[in-house]
Structures are given as C-alpha cells and as structure tokens.
Amino acid sequence: MADEPLLSVERLSKRFPVAGRRGSFLHAVDDVSFTLAVGESLGLVGESGCGKSTLVRLLARLIDATEGRIVFEGVDLAEIPAKRFARTPQRGAIQMVFQDPTDSLNPRYTARDTIREPCLLLAGMDAKAADARVDEVAQQVGLPQALLSRFPHQLSGGQKARVGIARALAPRPKLLILDEPTAALDVSVQAVVLQLLDRLRRELGLATLFVSHDLNVVRLLTDRVAVMYLGKIVEMGPSSAVFADPAHPYTQALVSAIPGHGPRIRLDGEVQSPIDPPPLCHFRSRCPAVQGRCQREAPPVRGGGHQVACHFA
C-alpha cells in the first residue's frame, strides 16, 4: 500500500550477556518501536550510553536483535542473520554515513575506488556503469574530479566527509543512517556538510535517521525526533513540537541546555543500571517530578503523533 512506511521497527530489543554473571543481561535497546516514511528525517537524541549506537547497529544489520522486527519495504530484516545481510538486495538500500570519515575510509583505496566498490558489490553494476555512477555522485556531493584519484591521507576532513557521503549514495539507497556525521569535523566544516546532507535528502527523496548530540541541528534538520534514555524511547513526535513543548522530564532537561530555551534544568541522582532493570520507570532516580507510582510500575506510552512514556506528562 502507498501509505505503508518505508521502515517499521516493532518492539525491538537487544540484550547482551554480562560476563561472569550467569543469567544477567545488559538491556542496550529495550522494546523500541517507530516508523519512518519515504523521504522523512527522524532525529535520534540522548546522552551517551542511552542505546543510540546499538540501535543504529541493529538497523544497519551489523548485529542481530534479541527480539522484535525491522520491517523494511515489507521484509523483516531481523529474520536475516547479520552475517548474511550483506548478500541481500536490501544491503544497498540501507547505507550509513559514519561518524569519523578518516576511520571509515580504506587508506589503500583512492576516493574513486571507495565510491566505486558499492556500485559493483551492492548495486550489481558493471565496470562502465560503476565509473559513470562515481562521476555522478561526485558531482552531487561537490567532489571535484581531480580529487577522485587521491588517497584519504591526501584529503581534508571535509573532502573525506564528501567521499563518505558519496560512497553511501552510490548504490542508490532509500534509507541513510547518519551516525553523528559531522562530530569529527572542524566547526567551520560542519555547517557545510550538514547543509549538503539536507539538500541531498530533499533532492533525492531519501529517508534519514539522524543521530546527533547537537540538539539544535536535530531541531533544524529533522521532521520528527525520538528521545532515548537507557534503551527506551521516552518521547517522540514532530521536531517542532518536541523542542517547543517537551513533555517528558528528561526531554525537558535536554532542551533546557539549548540557549534561549529557558532556565537550565540540572538532573541529580544516579543513572539506573541497564543490567536486568526492573519493569519500572528507568528515569525515576533522576526525575525531579518522581512520585510513588514511578517506583511501582513502568509508564505506558501515551499520545498519537506526539508520544511520551511518563505517568504524569
């Protein structure tokens, strides 16, 4: 059906066994659900350790899920073992732009080799078509032809970022996962790369999952935003609504750190352990509005377009 989402994540969880503690598990991603439409941009925010990176690895099929579904264009990718996913048609349809372009580029490959490889391996192009595609995406990302023969150590940070973006675009994906794509770049280059990514998303009709610590960037460049805390999505909705009127106490604290968003809310208390967490509110030890009910039961997810997991929001 035309109104079906491109991606539907349903009750996705990832638990890692804890060494030396038989029967104990670290709940990195805990019962996460969301959808992503064709051409839509979803931001993913939260403190370090909240589960963003694990969720990205699950969606990119780098690791297997413990439970749940990852339905992409009607196919449940969670049923395909991560080791086999690279040989499926969906591999080229889901691509990543990594946090550090230097670490993600093969030092023995020229820029042309790097962009050409997914054309051959993922898109099934012949050599002539692959070379033509390299030239096409190089032009799209603003990478001069003269730079295509250079190796990573001969490129600037911004140029390496463009190579990484071109590599991701080469097999004509439908979903781009942007994992802190400018975190390793100089501030002077970050804005240029972000503008490039936003323009390409709109021109090519790409769906994007944008992972970032920069809340201002997420607010400006995404249609919706999901806020994660200890493996769970605690709030999700239109970016404009979430940033203008955050409903969850954790989101309120995050947004208060943005200049011009009212007085800063500082969180006290200890972060709960993600190892074998009880079925209660994960935020209860730091929440300034905690009540007895929070200590007895997990909050349900409420709302339609703007969802929040809090008893009292």
Regions found by a protein language model. Give the residues of each.
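ABC transporter nucleotide-binding domains
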Residues: 1-244, 308, 313
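Short catalytic/signature loops enriched in Gly
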Residues: 3-5, 19, 25, 236-313
